[in-house]
């Protein structure tokens, strides 16, 4: 059974690329045609790449590997969090802090600080042992740390793979993963350079439905790898979005 159907890809608008004038020539082999100034992605090639990515991601999970989901743009934030949590993996959906992979020891200290502040707050110590001003400053610090690090709070080491929604926006995590030899799975729209992507998935990275569908397929691969569940259905739902890309 295919991990996703052509019908699902069409309904989610996976085939709508960016304006032709914004294209990256390196994406030419994945483009089917141009329609009304918009590049149309070849879904037959997308389907093949999705299946390749699914199988590799399934193997990583089966071997006990950990995956980091990355998507900080508005259209991706919800799907990234939902699907990472569903598959028991980690995520960054607010802001990528430089060095999250290449300087993970420092990031880990920030996570420890976050947990320390959480403990002080939960036990009421912030209110009993500190002034109101100090407590307010600590809570402000905790809020900022939680926003950026809550999705990786239990990540003990750099992940075995990362999954990225927008390669252009998430240029830094892609480069950090590449430097460390961590495989990169990513949705690649018609305006990106796919060279640093280990397992590229040609797809519309602007439409919410497209992002949710592809991200759910990746999560399904992890779930199957972890639990041996077969025939996992990709999650897609009707969302009122523009057919074309935002730019």
Curated annotation (Swiss-Prot):
A Pfam entry, by short name: Ribosomal_S2
Gene Ontology, cellular component aspect: cytosolic small ribosomal subunit
Keywords: Ribonucleoprotein, Ribosomal protein
GO molecular function, one term: structural constituent of ribosome
UniProt-listed GO biological process terms: translation
Family statement drawn from the similarity comment of this UniProt entry: Belongs to the universal ribosomal protein uS2 family.
Protein name: Small ribosomal subunit protein uS2
